[in-house]
Design a protein with these regions (language model features):
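Membrane/wall-proximal cationic-aromatic binding patches
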Residues: 57-167, 171-172, 313-316, 360
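Short, well-structured alpha-helical segments in soluble
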Residues: 194-207
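Conserved beta-strand elements of the Class I
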Residues: 140-144, 181, 209
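Histidine-centered active-site loop/cap adjacent to the catalytic His
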Residues: 33, 44, 49, 322-360
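N-terminal Lys/Arg-rich, disordered targeting/topogenic segments
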Residues: 1-26
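Membrane-interface motif at the C-terminal end of an N-terminal transmembrane signal
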Residues: 41-58
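Serine-dependent acyl-ester chemistry module
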Residues: 25, 60-70, 208-304, 309-319, ...
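N-terminal Sec-pathway targeting helices
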Residues: 19-40
Length: 360
C-alpha cells in the first residue's frame, strides 16, 4: 500500500470519528435542550397551577397560612396564651405524629406533654388514662370533635367534656360512675372524626357518642391549615391535580364532605347499636352566629339526633362565651356542658339510676 493510500484512509477514519463525535454532541445538546425545555415548562406549570390552586382554595373556603410551620416558641413562655405547634418537615410536632392511616393524616402523640397544660395520654387523646375495657358500673360517653372539643387554650378540667362529666357525677348516686372521654383533635374535619370513631373510639366501648360539630368541620381546610400542611406536596402541579379531584365533588355538592362523613357515622351507630348525638356549635361571622346551610336538614334526612346550641348562645352574651370566632372561653365551655347535660337528662339519653346502668 502506497503512502498516499494510507493518508487517504487516515483522513477517512478521522472524518468518520469527527462525524460520530458531532452526532453524539448533537444528541447530548438535544437531550440538554429537551431537559431544559421540560424544566422551563415545569416552572411555568408550577406558576400557572399555583395561581389556579389559590383560586380553588379561595372558592372552597380553605384557609392556608403563609407559613404552616407555626411559631410555637410561646408555648415555652405561656402555654395558655399560645396554642400553636411547630410542625417539622416529617409532618410531626411536639404533640402530633403523622398517622399511618391516610384518612386521619395525623394523630395526637401518645404521652406528649407541654408545661403541665397539655397532656396526651397513652391512648393518644387528651384526657386521663382510661382502660379500654369498661367497668360494669360505668356509663361511658365518648366525645369526638375538633379543637373546640380538644379545648383550645384551656386546661383539661375546663373543657366541656370534663365539665359534663362532673355534672353527671354530681347528679347520680355515689355508686354510679360516669366517664366522659375527650377525643377532640384540633384541625380534624368531619371525615377524620368519623374515621377516628371507627378506628379508636370504639375500642373504648362507649355507651353513648357525642359529636361536637363546628361549621368549619365541613370545609376542606380548617383550624389554621393543619389539613393543608399534611396534604400539600412538594409540587404545585401534583397538588393541583389532587385538589381538582376534590374540587369537582365540592362544586357538585357543597355538603359532600359532611354528607359522606355523617353517612359513615350513621353506619357505625347502626352496626354497633351505640347511639350518636350531634351537638351543633356556633361560629361568629360578622356580628351574627353562623350555621352551616343545609346541615340540620342533612341530619334530619339521616335521622341522626342533634342538639343545636346556636340559639342558646344567641340568647346570651355570646361574645363573653367565645374566645374567638369558634373557640370557647372557660365560661363558654361551662355553658356548653350545662346545656348538653340538660339535653341528655331531659331526653332520658343517659341512665339516672344504678339499676338503669346495670341494664344498659
Amino acid at each position: 500500500m502506497t503512502p498516499l493510500m494510507n493518508t487517504t484512509n487516515d483522513l477517512t477514519s478521522e472524518n468518520k470519528s469527527t462525524q460520530k463525535s458531532r452526532r453524539i454532541g448533537n444528541v447530548v445538546i438535544n437531550i440538554g435542550l429537551f431537559i431544559a425545555g421540560l424544566c422551563v415548562s415545569f416552572g411555568i406549570a408550577e406558576i400557572f397551577f399555583a395561581t389556579w390552586e389559590s383560586y380553588l382554595l379561595k372558592t372552597m373556603g380553605v384557609f392556608v397560612p403563609v407559613d404552616p410551620k407555626y411559631d410555637g416558641a410561646a408555648w415555652e413562655v405561656d402555654p395558655m396564651q399560645a396554642g400553636r405547634f411547630v410542625w417539622q418537615a416529617d409532618g410531626n410536632s411536639i404533640v402530633h405524629i403523622r398517622s399511618k392511616n391516610k384518612k386521619l393524616m395525623y394523630e395526637l402523640r401518645p404521652n406528649a406533654e407541654i408545661s403541665e397544660i397539655i397532656k396526651i395520654n397513652s391512648g393518644g387523646f387528651r384526657d386521663r388514662e382510661y382502660p379500654k375495657e369498661k367497668p360494669s358500673n360505668v356509663f361511658r360517653i365518648a366525645v369526638v370533635g375538633d379543637s373546640v372539643t380538644f379545648g383550645w387554650r384551656q386546661r383539661l378540667e375546663d373543657t366541656y367534656p370534663k365539665k359534663l362529666e362532673a355534672l353527671l357525677q354530681n347528679h347520680n348516686t355515689p355508686n354510679t360512675q360516669f366517664e366522659v372521654l375527650n377525643f377532640g383533635i384540633g384541625g380534624y374535619n368531619a371525615e377524620q372524626e368519623a374515621e377516628l370513631l371507627r378506628v379508636k373510639v370504639l375500642d373504648y366501648h362507649p355507651d353513648l357518642i357525642l359529636i361536637g360539630f363546628c361549621p368549619n368541620d365541613g370545609q376542606i381546610g380548617f383550624d389554621g391549615g393543619l389539613w393543608w400542611h399534611f396534604f400539600h406536596g412538594p409540587s404545585r402541579t401534583v397538588s393541583f391535580i389532587r385538589l381538582m379531584s376534590i374540587y369537582q365533588e365540592y362544586k357538585a355538592d357543597s355538603l359532600f364532605l359532611l354528607r359522606r362523613a355523617y353517612r359513615d357515622i350513621l353506619n357505625i351507630s347502626q352496626e354497633t347499636n351505640i347511639p350518636v348525638h350531634i351537638c351543633i356549635f356556633p361560629m361568629i361571622q360578622g356580628d351574627e352566629l353562623y350555621v352551616t346551610p343545609g346541615f340540620i336538614q342533612l341530619l334530619e334526612q339521616l335521622n341522626l339526633p342533634y342538639f343545636s346550641l346556636v340559639p342558646l348562645f344567641a340568647e346570651n352574651d355570646y361574645k363573653q362565651l367565645m374566645l374567638d370566632t369558634v373557640h370557647f372561653t372557660v365560661a363558654g365551655h361551662e355553658f356548653t356542658a350545662q346545656n348538653i347535660y340538660e339535653y341528655l337528662v331531659r331526653n332520658k339519653i343517659v341512665p339516672l339510676s344504678t339499676s338503669e346502668i346495670a341494664n344498659n
